[in-house]
């Protein structure tokens, strides 16, 4: 919603020492490519010792087993995933169903059904594939879950924050954002400057869909 320079400024104001950019081709790609691209860039700095990420599942053993299983999927699992995709399932759902049908441990299947855990598993896979010595540090995802639309307590999901910003309701975000971020957003809204939202692209997307051939 906000340009990369403003987001980088917020990160630095919040205590980050370095902000790195992930190319759009990777940031808009699958969790696997997103994770591998991110870890590859971090490895390139030569100073990566720990990789911290949020996850609904925090048992390291489960995430490591899931990373191993998804790195060496059998032909049967791959074929089932292909069939599921042809039925219109999303890739995460297709893989979840394929693993469940193959008798994979239920705790691994559960971890792969949670969005943040799935990305964490891909980070662990990427660390292994790139031969990194960095140690994964798992942080428990609590209170506001992925895509939660509620603004309550002291935590809010990114989805809920984006919705509030799109509704130009900055005041409701005061307790959920760092002071610098809140003041910048409030200042923009007071000047009538709205950040880019999905509604700004709806006509373009609709045109593209209607122009597609069968």
Cite the ranges covered by each PLM segment:
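Active-site cores that bind ATP or allylic diphosphates and position pyrophosphate for catalysis
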Residues: 22-214
């Amino acid at each position: 919603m906000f340009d990369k320079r403003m987001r980088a400024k917020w990160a630095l104001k919040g205590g980050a020492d370095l902000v790195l950019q992930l190319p759009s081709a990777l940031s808009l790609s699958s969790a696997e490519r997103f994770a591998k691209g991110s870890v590859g860039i971090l490895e390139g700095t030569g100073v990566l010792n720990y990789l911290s990420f949020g996850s609904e599942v925090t048992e390291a053993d489960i995430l490591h087993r899931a990373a191993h299983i998804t790195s060496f999927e059998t032909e049967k699992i791959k074929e089932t995933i292909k069939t599921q995709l042809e039925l219109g399932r999303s890739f995460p759902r297709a893989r979840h169903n394929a693993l469940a049908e193959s008798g994979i441990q239920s705790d691994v299947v559960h971890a792969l059904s949670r969005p943040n855990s799935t990305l964490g598993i891909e980070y662990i896979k990427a660390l292994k594939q790139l031969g990194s010595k960095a140690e994964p540090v798992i942080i428990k995802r609590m209170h506001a879950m992925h895509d939660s639309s509620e603004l309550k307590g002291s935590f809010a999901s990114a989805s809920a924050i984006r919705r509030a910003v799109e509704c130009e309701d900055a005041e409701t975000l005061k307790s959920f954002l760092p002071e610098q971020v809140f003041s910048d957003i409030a200042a923009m809204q007071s000047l009538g400057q709205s950040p880019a939202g999905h509604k700004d692209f709806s006509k373009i997307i609709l045109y593209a869909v209607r122009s597609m051939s069968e």
